[in-house]
Amino acid sequence: MAKTVFHSSIEGAQHGGKTLDEFVNFAKNAGAVGAEPSNYHLEDENGGFKSAIEIRETFDKYDMKLDGISCHCPIWVHTTAWTESKTIRPFLPKNIWTKSAIEIEAWTEKYIFRFLELSAELGIKIVPMFWGMSHGFEVATGYPFGFFEGPEYDLISEGNERFVNKTSGIRQKANDYGIYLCHEIHPNTAALCADDFNMLVTSCDDDPCLGVTADPSHCWEGEDFETRFRKVGTRIYAAAVKNFVIRSGLNLRSMT
């Protein structure tokens, strides 16, 4: 007899304006069997997280499966804070983003530790996310035209070392809990293509917690999804399936 392996589910990262109850209710009414809230849906009103019991009760209320919990923004901020970019501000409380880069990095690391602890309590093994700008904006944006190595500098090797050092605590926690941190290969992150991701894995001595979320809609810079996901296939633990069209003739990067 045939056995159902997959079920319909909804990613919650695009539903940040909803409460956890509103999001799970929305997913139920949309016809999904499960849902994946983001870290923000799980926050309480006191700067912490809801209890695992409260979260479970919300899903049980609607007879929905908890398929995972994403944590894109805090992890991106953690590996981007060193750049002192203002673009981390939308994802942080004002009393945090006004602090120094070192203080912001320390705060987000503690936040991520608490998030991973809660995820483990809920039995979560897969966390969709993306690493931040560990190698800097020059490398991630392609400027200045690939001159990533020059007199007394090597942005790639420096970035690899930075990634290893800054993520070591988070990776250790994930491994302790048996959680896979599934990076979405994506512009303006630590890995823009499959080769970049494999470089990170090598730099981290093949750390088993480093995974990939396969999302074909992110293949908009020339690397098609078959090329990308064959290269990182052994590291794929999550996937996102969407209706999408990559339109030709449009500039990917624009200031207007």
Q: Where are the regions a protein language model picked out?
A:
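Active-site-proximal loop/turn and secondary-structure-junction residues that shape catalytic pockets
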Residues: 9-11, 39-41, 72-75, 131-135, ...
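Hydrophobic faces of well-ordered beta-strands that scaffold small-molecule active sites
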Residues: 2-10, 33-37, 66-71, 127-129, ...
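Active-site acidic/histidine proton-transfer and metal-coordination neighborhood
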Residues: 17, 22, 80-212
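Glycine-rich, proline-tolerant flexible connector loops at the mouths of alpha/beta enzymes
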Residues: 36-61, 82, 131-138
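Flexible glycine/acidic-rich beta-alpha junction loops that bind and position SAM and/or redox cofactors
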Residues: 74-81, 133-139, 221, 244-255
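A short, Lys/Arg-enriched amphipathic alpha-helix followed by its capping loop at the start of a domain
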Residues: 3, 22-32
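Short amphipathic alpha-helices and their capping/turn segments at secondary-structure boundaries
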Residues: 22-25, 46-67, 111-125, 224-237
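Gly/Pro-rich active-site loop or hairpin
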Residues: 11-18, 24, 45-48, 194-198, ...
